[in-house]
A protein has these predicted regions:
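Generic serine detector
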Residues: 35, 44, 49, 64, ...
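Catalytic cores of alpha/beta
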Residues: 41-56, 77-89, 95-110
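Glycine-rich phosphate-binding active-site loops on the catalytic face of alpha/beta enzymes
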Residues: 1-13, 58-72, 107-129
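Histidine/lysine/aspartate-rich catalytic loop segments that bind and position anionic ligands
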Residues: 21-22, 31-70
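Alpha-helix-loop-beta-strand connector modules within alpha/beta enzyme cores
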Residues: 1, 14-38, 74-97, 128-137
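Loop/helix-junction capping segments adjacent to catalytic residues or to phosphate/diphosphate-binding pockets
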Residues: 15-19, 43-44, 69-70, 97, ...
Length: 137
């Protein structure tokens, strides 16, 4: 297998970042970069969680900032600003061709995540992928 990195994120029973368990996985993943997935959005204080994830050594956080990127765009903007290039904030969760330009310009994020699934098909749509690519050039 060829691996470029790992995506995971462990929360404790209180839905806070489990420092020790994440630290163990990051150590096991070395030398590969790690991204914290959308479990981040379940924490009660995203700004504090941001600092914890940075301290752990994650390189990216996949987050919607709320239930989806539309609802969380102000939070995403705040997270990008507070990250100060110490970690990449990657908006994802409801990101489609219909909103990527707005989320891009509003948040100033540099990386984005989309499943490119439309019409509840459960499968990424090639036309949606190509449209997303054309909109973020």
């Amino acid at each position: 297998f060829r691996v470029d990195g790992f995506v995971f994120g462990i929360l404790n029973k209180e839905n806070e970042i489990d420092f020790e368990r994440n630290q163990e996985l990051i150590a096991l993943a070395k030398p590969f970069p790690c991204s914290f997935h959308r479990a981040f959005d379940r924490t009660s204080d995203l700004e504090n969680s941001l600092e914890t994830v940075i301290k752990l050594g994650f390189k990216t956080i996949l987050t919607s900032g709320a239930n989806n990127v539309n609802d969380g765009k102000q939070t995403l903007k705040t997270l990008v600003k507070k990250a100060k290039n110490r970690i990449t904030i990657m908006p994802g969760g409801g990101l489609r061709s219909t909103n990527i330009q707005e989320i891009d310009s509003f948040t100033n994020a540099t990386y984005f995540h989309s499943s490119a699934i439309i019409n509840d098909s459960g499968i990424a749509n090639l036309d949606e992928i190509n449209l997303l690519k054309s909109l973020i050039k």
